[in-house]
């Protein structure tokens, strides 16, 4: 999980001190892949923001030393920050052989899912809104200023465009909840399901697929309001 990176860093420091002593730079997964491809140690703005150590104030963008000092993160472990749209290096000879790419192919900073899903959905201009539903889910709107609504637990985060923010109302478990319902509730109806689908459920893979189909059919028969049933799906 990308959550709570600071405390994972501190955990390694406390429980694996010998490994901690060997640290050169602290990278996210995407940045590690950039390193493997190009040999460059960098971190994009959205990844830096995800560490909670990035100063987003205009004119102050960069690692925030006071916060790093407060939580015990060493500044020398933090990589230079780059824009998502910035060329950060080129594919090395060794990486080119592994990847089947031409040596010297440009490597860009890129972005994480929260940054690039909006781009893929076409939500790139101020006011554009998109809805995403995967394992997690959110409603996101491109805004000009960083905004926080502590009452509604909604905040604007750094995205792929360095000049705007993504105002996110996020749910940790969206379609993951559908999987939970399938595993914990729908299997109680397996007799009904098998009777209906018969040999179509011979393999586990088909059972997984067809159970979702069966769920959708059942859901289609439920009236608006679900007869008063409320599901609050903040699952772990």
PLM regions: where:
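A short glycine-threonine-serine/GTX helix/turn-capping micro-motif
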Residues: 1-3, 52-54, 162-174
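Catalytic-loop motifs flanking and including active-site residues across diverse enzymes
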Residues: 4, 8, 115, 173-177
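Conserved ATP-utilizing enzyme core subdomain
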Residues: 38-39, 43, 199-236
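ATP-dependent carbohydrate kinase catalytic cores
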Residues: 56-162, 172-173, 185, 189, ...
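Active-site catalytic microenvironments for nucleophilic, acid-base chemistry
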Residues: 15, 36, 40, 122, ...
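Gly/Ser/Thr-rich active-site cleft segment
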Residues: 1-111, 232-235
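Extended catalytic-interface subdomain
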Residues: 29-30, 174-177, 182
């Amino acid at each position: 999980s990308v959550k709570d990176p600071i405390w994972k860093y501190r955990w390694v420091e406390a429980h694996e001190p010998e490994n901690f002593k060997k640290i050169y730079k602290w990278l996210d997964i995407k940045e590690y892949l950039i390193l493997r491809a190009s040999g460059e140690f960098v971190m994009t703005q959205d990844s830096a923001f995800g560490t909670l150590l990035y100063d987003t104030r205009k004119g102050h963008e960069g690692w925030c030393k006071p916060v790093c000092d407060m939580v015990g993160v060493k500044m020398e472990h933090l990589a230079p920050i780059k824009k998502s749209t910035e060329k950060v290096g080129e594919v090395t000879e060794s990486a080119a052989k592994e990847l089947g790419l031409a040596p010297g192919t440009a490597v860009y900073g890129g972005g994480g899912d929260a940054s690039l899903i909006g781009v893929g959905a076409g939500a790139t201009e101020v006011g554009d809104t998109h809805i995403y539903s995967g394992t997690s889910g959110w409603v996101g709107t491109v805004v000009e200023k960083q905004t926080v609504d502590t009452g509604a637990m909604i905040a604007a985060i750094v995205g792929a465009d360095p000049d705007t923010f993504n105002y996110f109302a996020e749910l940790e478990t969206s379609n993951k909840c559908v999987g939970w319902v399938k595993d914990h509730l729908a299997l109680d109806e397996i007799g009904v399901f098998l009777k209906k689908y018969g040999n179509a459920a011979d393999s586990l893979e088909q059972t997984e697929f067809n159970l979702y189909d069966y769920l959708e059919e059942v859901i289609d028969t439920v009236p608006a309001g679900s007869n008063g049933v409320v599901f609050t799906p903040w699952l772990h």
